[in-house]
Amino acid sequence: MEKEQTGGAETRVTMNNYTKEDIIRLVDEEDVEFIRLQFTDLFGNLKNIAVTASQLDRVLSNKCMFDGSAIDGFARIEESDMYLYPDLSTLEIFPWRPQQGKVARMICDVYRPNGQPFEGDPRYVLKRAVQQAEDMGYTFEVGPECEFFLFNTDENTMPTTNTHEQAGYFDIGPLDFGENARRDIVMNLEDMGFVIEASHHEMAPAQHEIDFRYDEALHTADNIMTFKMAVRTIARRHGLHATFMPKPRFGVNGSGMHINMSLQKDGKNIFQDASDPNGLSEEAYYFIGGIMRHIKGMAAITNPLVNSYKRLVPGFEAPVYIAWSTTNRSPLIRIPAAADGEGTRIELRSPDSAANPYLTLAVCLSAGLEGIQEKIEPPQSINANIFALSEKEREELHIDQLPGTLLEAVEELEKDTFIQKVLGDHIAGKYIDAKRKEWHEYRSQVSEWEIQEYLYKY
């Protein structure tokens, strides 16, 4: 339901500018029976309230109320009434549902009864950061690279980590057992207006990647949530379980969500400067500097799970060290080659797909903007394989490390008052408390590794 707009070297996807009357007409003409009002909780989980088409007038008048105290991290029971305000531009009809009695969705913002945006709504946090960029004359554009696994299910259709395939990077069928499911996912996403640039098998058995066209930050965050929902739904129809868990299997590559970022001003990519040896402008360098200053404090957002830090280890093409480069993939930040200056972008390689995309893009943008405002110079680029450097060599080059555990990441977030301010007091406090609880629950568990390692010996 989105339209492609051709301009320059790229074809971009534009948002729909639906009115209430358009929505009512489309729901009637398309025989839509149910409308899902979707929103995202603090931890990146998609939630929804389903209403019938007969309730559309109430929905479009922003009168759909729900109990915010039932959503983790939202509100206390004594102030729990919340309202869903649908973003009309996000209306989409699910292509995988029956053609009679169709199901559509609209993504919603969360508001308090007094008509004020709810400060605990992650979408509002990103909107606030985007507004700051717009006040500076910038448009923040983002292209994600979403990786996931397609695993078998058991006889009760419950998910497992089993797969019968041994396919690797760029392999095709019959080695790639998930090829049919991946193709079906792509076709359904295209029916929903996605522009799919590439899809392929990834490094690990049963691991896949689908890349869709860059867009403005809010639309991209919405698309990431839609993408994850569609991938899981279509995979299940193929008898598979799709997971965005960062490291579901030991000894193989984990799944990341690399974030490609650029800033536009007056329709031009301001990260590009043909006169610079690296093709980068001052703003691009400062943006890198801002992210590198705050990346430790951002880690609990970009890598939110205990399991996230089992991906961020040497040997599996995931970043561990805080550095940037134009020539290799071992650092945290890479500057991909661009055929023309308009494609110049900054690739942040640490985030994973378990992250809340609204909060992730908000902290990335805000850190980068602070870099521009304060003219934060990044350190010298590192064009060597950082994993091949000795500890002494890394110290001499002043190369720091990302947090090694969720606990370390939470402690870094507690120290970074700037990132806390970006999130807001409500989200920062609730998030830190929840992640500390998650860590303490994890550390009290007894793993299979411990049983195998210690039970016989001791």
Regions found by a protein language model. Give the residues of each.
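ATP/Mg2+-dependent ligation/transfer catalytic cores
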Residues: 1-198, 220, 240, 397-458
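Catalytic-core signal marking the mid-to-C-terminal active-site face
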Residues: 3-4, 226, 233-236, 240-241, ...
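Broad gene-expression machinery/nucleic-acid interaction feature
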Residues: 34, 46, 103-107, 143-147, ...
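A generic structural motif
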Residues: 41, 111-117, 174, 214-220, ...
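Flexible loop/turn segments at secondary-structure boundaries
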Residues: 42-47, 114-115, 150, 205, ...
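Core alpha/beta catalytic barrel or barrel-like domain that forms the active/cofactor pocket
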Residues: 141-152, 159-161, 192-212, 242-262, ...
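Active-site-proximal beta-alpha loop/turn segments in soluble metabolic enzymes
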Residues: 162-172, 205-220, 249-254, 266-271
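Short, contiguous, pocket-lining structural segments
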Residues: 173, 177-181, 198-204, 216-227, ...
